[in-house]
């Protein structure tokens, strides 16, 4: 999986959904790995903002992914500031 950028909850959810599918996992099986319900995985993948940070970190670990924080590129920041 190549580096991907998520600038909002929905983009992050889509990235996690692709990663889960690439690993051949259903939402239910991922939920079992992190001891959460399938509905919790579904909410995270849908970009619902109420999902706890701890749950996000568990999902990242189960999918063998990591969170990287870096400065936003200026071009994207300028475009988003326009809206």
Mark where each language-model region is.
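A short, Lys/Arg-rich alpha-helix, primarily the initiator
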Residues: 1-22
């Amino acid at each position: 999986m190549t580096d991907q950028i998520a600038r909002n909850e929905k983009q992050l959810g889509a990235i996690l959904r692709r990663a889960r599918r690439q690993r051949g996992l259903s939402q239910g099986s991922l939920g079992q790995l992190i001891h959460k319900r399938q509905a919790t995985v579904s909410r995270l993948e849908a970009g619902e903002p109420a999902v706890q940070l701890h749950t996000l970190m568990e999902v990242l670990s189960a999918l063998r992914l990591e969170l990287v924080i870096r400065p936003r590129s200026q071009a994207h920041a300028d475009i988003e500031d326009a809206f």
